[in-house]
C-alpha cells in the first residue's frame, strides 16, 4: 500500500530571486503567491519536550521565498491536470497525495514556470512560521 501524505502541503517551495513578493502565473486565472523571508539566525528545537526536537541549536539561514498560502486543489489541478484530494474543494488545501506525486508536481511546476522550486527545509519552514527576521507579505 502506498504511503500517503495526509498533512496539508504548504506550497513552501523555495527559490532564490530578488524582490519582496512574487506572483507565479500557473494559467490565465490561477496563481501562486510567494513571499520573501530575510535570512538570519534562530534557535531550532528545544531542550525540553519531545525527544526528536532536542537539543535546541542555532541555525543560520540565507534569504529565501516561501509560499504565502497552502497549495490549493485548483493550483494542483492547474499543474497536474487532476485532483488527488479525497474531498473535492478547489479553494481548499490539496491533500492525500503520495510523496511521489508531490515530487512529480514540483518537477512539472519547475517546467511550467522555468524556476527551481523545492520543498523547504525543516529549519526554513520553522523560521518562516515564526516570522523570520523581516518577512514581507
Model-assigned labels for residue ranges:
Residues 3-5, 11-123, 130-133:
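Extended beta-strand/loop cores of jelly-roll/beta-sandwich
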Residues 136-137:
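Chymotrypsin/trypsin-fold serine protease catalytic domain
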